[in-house]
Amino acid sequence: MKGEILMEEKTYLKWYNKVGYGTGDIAGNVVYAFLSSFVMIYLTNTVGLNSGIVGTLIAVSKLFDGVTDIFFGTMIDHTKSKMGKARPWMFYGFFGCAITLFGVFAIPTSLGKTAQYAWFFIAYTLLNAVFYTANNIAYAALTSLVTKNSKERVQMGSFRFMFSFGTNLVIQSVTVGAVEMFGGGATAWRTIAFIYCIIGIITNTLAVFSVKELSDEELKDDSVAGEEDDKLSFKKIIKLQIGRAHV
């Protein structure tokens, strides 16, 4: 081609790394789909809470989101560990997600109404504004930390979308029937929440250990053509995450 040299981008990931990374959206959507679609049904029909009060508590809880987005983005940016910057937050953050998700669906029916509202608000706020935020921001950051290849980043996003769509579809389709199968009532909701938490822990762990973050030296290396604009920028990640839909 008359001296024209085609430079091919260096590849960093195998197909199973990309698939494994994508399974992290199974974990994220086990939380998101289950909570957003069924928490109000559980709280009003099983626990007997007022939907208006619950809605107000959820709205108040979301006020913390913007602050925690910035906080965890900054924390990830300054993290140095053997696992890298983002993977520790993604890994440990989901254990918090699992505990608090179970807590939301395990409100003791023996408590008074005020205590039940307080239980829900605390568990929901910790889940949404703390643990889910930490896990989700770290998960999003990984695409810039494990590869500098733009095509691989697009492919990682495609696997995320596939697993996200599939998980949402399954959760929406089977949850009500599963609750009825376990007898309905508070015990059934706790059982389903526990099952989803285990699924989330397994798939999140798989996603975390399916990829390895590049070293700081590799991330700063501009030898790959066209990568100058793709350097890791947590400020950009934070801005994107602030605009994302929370639980």
Where are these regions (language model features)?
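Membrane-embedded alpha-helical bundles of multi-pass transporters/translocases
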Residues: 3-246
